[in-house]
């Protein structure tokens, strides 16, 4: 279970501070949680605070009873928190197969790696040996990143606006991926989205 106690975050803006989050108290023990709302509401900031990418100005974060407030993003990842960025990172020199294998944390075969790609709507044979570089579109990178999260199968998987950059892949297929993930993993899924239709998974 994830618990946030009195979480606040202030961003510096010149000589002043802008309050992004204020006294957030939240418990997440459900299988699926979605934060929806307009731009600038602090949704992505809250997700990054949970993942350890941003340090809160005030408050504490607990994961399964352990205070993880001071832990780095790497340490939180080791404890079972995955984070999928709104704009996925490119890795020149690393193939899609390599990336999925690294994400899984174990040696996996081609067929298993391909199965993760198929689950996110990619033709595995066209992508498995490609480099994760600028030759891939934003939508392709997004789907590959979701495949790595599926491979990790962590206790808490956070997706920051997963629909961003997906042009040719329908939103309905994206929802189908999360529905499948919801059935397969034992952990919780936290999605940040502008699309209220994502709530249909819950």
For the regions a protein language model found, what residue spans apply to each?
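Q-loop/switch helix immediately C-terminal to the Walker
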Residues: 87, 93-109
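Walker B catalytic motif
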Residues: 161-162, 169
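Conserved ABC transporter NBD signature motif
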Residues: 59-66, 79, 112
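Conserved structural motif at the start of ABC-family nucleotide-binding domains
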Residues: 2, 19-23
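ABC ATPase C-loop
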Residues: 149-150
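ABC ATPase NBD coupling module
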Residues: 67-82
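Helix-to-loop junction immediately C-terminal to a conserved catalytic motif
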Residues: 51
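The feature captures the beta-strand-to-loop junction immediately N-terminal to the Walker
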Residues: 36-39
């Amino acid at each position: 279970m994830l618990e946030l106690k009195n979480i606040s975050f202030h961003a510096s803006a010149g000589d002043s501070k802008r309050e992004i989050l204020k006294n957030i108290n939240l418990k997440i023990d459900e299988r699926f949680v979605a934060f929806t709302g307009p731009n600038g509401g602090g949704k992505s900031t809250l997700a990054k605070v949970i993942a350890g990418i941003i340090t809160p100005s005030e408050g504490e974060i607990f994961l399964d009873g352990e205070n993880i407030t001071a832990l780095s993003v790497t340490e939180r990842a080791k404890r079972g928190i995955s984070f999928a960025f709104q704009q996925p990172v490119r890795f020149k020199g690393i193939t899609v197969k390599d990336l999925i294998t690294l994400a899984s944390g174990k040696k996996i075969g081609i067929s298993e790696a391909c199965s993760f790609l198929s689950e996110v709507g990619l033709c595995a044979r066209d992508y498995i040996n490609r480099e994760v570089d600028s030759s891939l579109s934003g939508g392709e990178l997004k789907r590959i990143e979701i495949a790595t999260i599926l491979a990790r199968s962590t206790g808490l998987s956070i997706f920051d606006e997963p629909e961003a950059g997906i042009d040719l892949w329908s939103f309905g297929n994206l929802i189908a991926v999360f529905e499948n993930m919801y059935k397969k993993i034992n952990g919780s899924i936290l999605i940040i989205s502008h699309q209220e239709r994502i709530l249909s998974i819950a």
